């Protein structure tokens, strides 16, 4: 059931910065209410990544929210004709690959990713040629053309499991340099991990958000926010894409959903009073709303410029175009059938190996 306009107003006032003017609250409320109204009217699924700002994130039902792996599964399972993906372009591409018969839309097709933008199909071909016969595992933060050149895909939630499930004693991991190093540490010698940027092996890409966190930053948080290592009710969380030396300082590390689940478990047990998350700041914003009893130290200078391109003002016109039966070309994700077919294989293999865990 769609919220009334008055209910939306109250939710925005409770959720947002109290410095919002009455006019700003009204503008947001009218926009959100209209989006939710059209979403329900046309049976549109709105998938929301954890890095969306709270007002955008809140457009998605709980089952429509999550990290790349969860949203990929949701895209594959939905029967809706229209999928609006509130995330970045590679995520919307993945939804299209898994549901080629569906119409997948993204509010801004220029919403890229520093990992995907800096490592494409040509780079995959080069590293594969340098290591013939070695399986290539590609992080989901990549475009369809690059995925099409690989054997299996992975997300930050399942990379270690997928790596161990592959045949042989070595694998190629692309494109994330820091994630590859962290995966290598996690596997503890059970597999050799080959990755771009290793030795003289070309360049590796990094996440422009997570690379900002340094060891000095993490130690400053521990001291300034009083989160000593091993504290029973205070925890420091780190995302897989951070530098290895930062990851080693964590009380818990993982994907956004793994971090969220750990917080939920500790809150349920009454064993979490304070937390810091070394990741995109809107993840913390959304968790602050979900877990109001936890004191979070925010890092909201650390924002993904690509995720920030997805706004209420860009989402509403898509739904209005659906309502009017207008052309959706400027928002629609369109991939060549051959690319969809080739990129689907490594994603489907990931799904199969994940389900076997």
Regions found by a protein language model. Give the residues of each.
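Active-site loop-to-helix "anion-binding N-cap" substructures in soluble metabolic enzymes
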Residues: 1-357
